[in-house]
Curated annotation (Swiss-Prot):
GO biological process: proteolysis
NCBIfam families registered for this protein in UniProt: PRK00024.1 (NF000642), radc (TIGR00608)
PANTHER family: DNA REPAIR PROTEIN RADC, UPF0758 PROTEIN YEES-RELATED
Manganese is among the record's keywords: no
InterPro entries: MPN, RadC_JAB, UPF0758, UPF0758_CS, UPF0758_N
Organism per entry: Alkaliphilus metalliredigens (strain QYMF)
Domain MPN: from-to ranges: 110-232
Family the UniProt entry places it in: Belongs to the UPF0758 family.
Protein name stated in the entry: UPF0758 protein Amet_2289
Keywords: Hydrolase, Metal-binding, Metalloprotease, Protease, Zinc
Motif (JAMM motif): 181-194
Annotated residues for binding of Zn(2+): 181, 183, 194
GO molecular-function terms, A-Z: metal ion binding; metallopeptidase activity
C-alpha cells in the first residue's frame, strides 16, 4: 500500500523533477538534501511520499542534516514513518559518508602537533554519544596511514589492552601511533584510568619499538594533550 502510493506520488511529478531522474540526468549535486535522502529511503509510507518522509526526517531536529551524523538507530525510529529498515538505511549511508570523508582527509596527512590531530578528528568525534578509543597509525614521516577504532564504551584497562592496540599497528607497519578518544560529556580532562591506560600503552610501545607519541582526548570543540601536559 505504502509503495503504491509512493509510486503514484512520484508519477504525478514531472519526469525531470523526479529525484532519481534528476540524479541520472544532472548528477547528484543537482539534488536537494530531501531528494538525496528520498533516494536512500526508496519508499515512503501510507501518508507520505519518500520526499515528504525525507523532509520530515531532516526537520526532526533544528540541526537538520548535521543531526543525522551521530544519530542512534533508536532515535531515528522515534520519527514517524521510520522503522528499523529505514533507520538502518539512513545510518548505513551516513557511516559510508563519514568513512569516505575521513579517508580523503587522512591520506598522507602529516601530524606535527596536537592541533593537527584535533583538526583531523575533532568534527568526527566531538558529538559522539559513547566513548570511542581510536588510534592514528603513522609512518616514519608521521604521516597518517589510517585511523583505527579499538573499542567503544567506557575506557578501562580490560577493554583497551596493549595487544589489541599494537596488533593493528604491527599489521599496518606503523612506526608510531597516537591515541585518541572522546569524552561525551564535552570535558576533555583525563581521568585516572585515562592516565593509567596511556602509561601502560607507552611502556608496551617501547618494548615493541612503536612509539606512542601522544594521547589526545576530544571534548566539545576542545582537546587535551597528555604529551603537552607532561603526563606521559
Amino acid at each position: 500500500m505504502g509503495k503504491s502510493q509512493y509510486v503514484t506520488g512520484i508519477k504525478k511529478m514531472p519526469i525531470n523533477e523526479r529525484p532519481r531522474e534528476k540524479l541520472l540526468n544532472y548528477g547528484p549535486e543537482s539534488l536537494s538534501n530531501p531528494e538525496l535522502l528520498a533516494i536512500i529511503l526508496s519508499t515512503g509510507t501510507k501518508e507520505m511520499s519518500a520526499i515528504d518522509l525525507a523532509t520530515h526526517v531532516l526537520s526532526y531536529s533544528e540541526e537538520g542534516l548535521r543531526h543525522l551524523k551521530n544519530c542512534e538507530i533508536e532515535e531515528l525510529q522515534q520519527i514517524k514513518g521510520v522503522g528499523i529498515a529505514k533507520a538502518s538505511q539512513i545510518l548505513a549511508a551516513v557511516e559510508l559518508g563519514k568513512r569516505i570523508s575521513l579517508t580523503s582527509r587522512v591520506n598522507h596527512y602529516r601530524i606535527k602537533s596536537p592541533d593537527d590531530v584535533s583538526n583531523l578528528l575533532m568534527e568526527e568525534m566531538r558529538y559522539l554519544k559513547k566513548e570511542y578509543f581510536n588510534i592514528a597509525l603513522l609512518n616514519t614521516k608521521h604521516e597518517v596511514i589510517a585511523i583505527e577504532n579499538i573499542s567503544i564504551g567506557s575506557l578501562n584497562a580490560s577493554i583497551v589492552h596493549p595487544r589489541e592496540v599494537f596488533v593493528v599497528a604491527i599489521k599496518r607497519s606503523s612506526s608510531a601511533i597516537i591515541l585518541v578518544h572522546n569524552h561525551p560529556s564535552g570535558d576533555p580532562s583525563p581521568s585516572g584510568e585515562d592516565i593509567r591506560i596511556t602509561k601502560r600503552l607507552v611502556e608496551a610501545g617501547k618494548l615493541l619499538g612503536i612509539e606512542v607519541l601522544d594521547h589526545i582526548i576530544i571534548g566539545d570543540n576542545v582537546y587535551y594533550s597528555l604529551k603537552e601536559k607532561s603526563m606521559m
